[in-house]
Amino acid sequence: MASKWNWSGTKGRRTPRRPYGRPYKSSVPTTRVVVHQSAVLKKDEVVGTEIKPEGDVARYKMKKVMLTCTLRMAPGELVNYLIVKCNSPISSWSAAFTSPALLVKESCQDMITIIAKGKVESNGVAGTDCTKSFNRFIKLGAGITQTQHLYVVLYTSVALKAVLEHRVYVEV
C-alpha cells in the first residue's frame, strides 16, 4: 500500500478524485537574478562570456536561463552563437572552438557540452546599421551548480556592439 505522506513528512490533501495523498517532493524556492553586459566584438573573432548570478551567492543551482542579446550591425552580416556547459573554466576561446562554425575542437570535446545554438543574420539597406536580437529560454534539466560553468560563445563576421542580458532562475 502506498504511503499517505509526502517527502517532507506532512500528509497531502484528500479530494474525491484522489482520496489518498501521493508523496510529492516539496518545491525549492527560486530567485531571479538579472545581469546586464555590453561589449564591442571584433571581426572574425570567437568570444564568450559566463552566465552566472552576480552578487554574494556562494552556493546555488541554476535551473533555467532566459537569454536576450541585442546586436547592432551592418546588413548582410552573420553572428553565430552557442550556449555551452563546461566543468572547468575556458581560458582560450579560439583554442576550444573553430572560427566560423563554432564547432568544439577535438582537444576539448570531453569537457564541453553544447546546450543550444543559433545564428542571427541581418538584412536591410546598404549603408545603414540595423538592430537584431535573439531570445532563448534554456531549461538546464538537473541544473548547473556553482562548480560548473555556463557560457554563451559568439562569432561575428563584422565588428559590432552587443548587449547581453540574462535572467537566471536560481535555487539557493
UniProtKB/Swiss-Prot annotation:
The domain of life for this entry's organism is Viruses
Chain intervals with Basic residues compositional bias:
11-20
What Gene Ontology terms describe where this protein resides (cellular component)? T=1 icosahedral viral capsid
Compartments annotated for it: namely: Virion
Name the keywords, alphabetized: Capsid protein, T=1 icosahedral capsid protein, Virion
The record's section on InterPro entries has: Nanovirus_coat (IPR006753)
Spell out the residue ranges making up region: Disordered: 1-26
Family per UniProt?
Belongs to the nanoviridae capsid protein family.
The protein's name is Capsid protein
Organism expressing this protein natively: Faba bean necrotic yellows virus (isolate Egyptian EV1-93)
Q: What is the lineage of its organism?
A: Viruses, Monodnaviria, Shotokuvirae, Cressdnaviricota, Arfiviricetes
